């Protein structure tokens, strides 16, 4: 679920958020983004 994406997904300092994005999509959200090195899902 989306909370596990926040914990699991690494957000690097150069904004690579593929892992976060993928996790959020699997959780049923539209996309994922990195905010202050944390993964956030966009419903």
UniProtKB/Swiss-Prot annotation:
One of its GO terms (molecular function) is potassium channel inhibitor activity. Disulfide bonds join 5-23, 11-34, 20-39, 24-41. GO terms for cellular component: extracellular region. It holds the Pfam family Toxin_17. Expressed by the venom gland. InterPro entries: Ergtoxin, Scorpion_toxin-like_sf. It is found in: Secreted. Keywords: Disulfide bond, Ion channel impairing toxin, Knottin, Neurotoxin, Potassium channel impairing toxin, Secreted, Toxin, Voltage-gated potassium channel impairing toxin. The keyword Secreted applies. Belongs to the ergtoxin family. Gamma-KTx 4 subfamily. The presence of a 'disulfide through disulfide knot' structurally defines this protein as a knottin. Reversibly blocks Kv11/ERG potassium channels. This is Potassium channel toxin gamma-KTx 4.1. The lineage of its organism: Eukaryota, Metazoa, Ecdysozoa, Arthropoda, Chelicerata.
């Amino acid at each position: 679920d989306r909370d596990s994406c926040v914990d699991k997904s690494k957000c690097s300092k150069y904004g690579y958020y593929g892992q976060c994005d993928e996790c959020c999509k699997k959780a049923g959200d539209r996309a994922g983004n990195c905010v202050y090195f944390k993964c956030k899902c966009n419903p």
